[in-house]
Every structure is written in structure tokens, then in C-alpha cells.
Amino acid sequence: MGASMNIGVRGSKLAIEYAKQVEAKCFNSFHTNLITIKTDGDIFENKSIQDIGGKGVFVSAIEQQLLDKKIDVAVHSFKDLPAVMDSRLEISAVLERNDPRDCYIGTLFPKAIVGTGSPRRIAQLKTNFNVDFDIQHIRGNIDTRIQKLEQGKYDAIILAVAGLEALDLQHK
């Protein structure tokens, strides 16, 4: 093995799984350490993304670690990146895109309580269904969202197929 590489990543199962993919595809000749970093988006899980700063809440703490040279590489989900990046940083690699589809878990019916944290998904629900759903905000990692569904807090939740597949949860 060659040099050592510290890879900064959020601590969710999904983020770690994606970091392992980056590790295997980009850094297989290095000894690597996955360094999990809590972000504002992780710490303030009960607040909306807009209430805690909007775009960047899942990346700013990791990027600061990169700028402070505490990590060598940061792994992010593209959807979490702000439109304008810090000029001192660059995107060095992008893995092939996974399945871009969304799916629902649960039961959809008129007035169903549907959980999503995405403005895009809310717009798609309102545009693509002639049904009046009760769309409620939901935050948390995939496991947390599924748990909230199973506890009866929602009738259905909308999730990314790619995330479910990465965690081998597509059977849900």
C-alpha cells in the first residue's frame, strides 16, 4: 500500500456506503481512513434545511475540515452541494450516477400523509397525482424515515431508489 488518505464524510450509513465506493474506485492504491464528521444538517435534524441555512448545511463542516487540512478528500452527495462553491476547493471526481428515480414506500390514497423533505418531490406529487395528499415535512436518514413510517407517523414516504439500493433496502 502507498500513502495514507483521510476521507471526510457524514456519518450516515448511506454517506459511508458512498464513501466506500469512492474509496474503491479512486483510492485503491492508498491506505484510507474514513473520518465521519457531523454537519449542521445532522445536528439540527428536527429543523427544516431552510431554517438552518439552506444549501450547504450537509457540506460546510466537512469542507472546513478539508480547508484546515484535517482530511485530504471530502465525499458529498451532489444534491447537497451549494450552487456556488468555495473558490479554494474543487470537484476532483464524480462517480457514475446511480438510479435517478424516486419511489414511495407505504400506501397512497386521498388525504394520505406523505413524508418528503424535498421541494422537488412536493412539486412532483402535486403535479403528477390528481389526489389531495397531506404532504408533511420529514427529515432524517433512510433508516429514521422508514422507522417513522413503520411507527404510523406517515402513510407513505418518498425516497431515492439509489439510496435504497445502496443500503440493500430496495425490498422495502
Task: Tell me what each language-model feature is.
Residues 1-172:
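Domain-level signature for soluble enzymes in the chorismate/prephenate branch of the shikimate pathway
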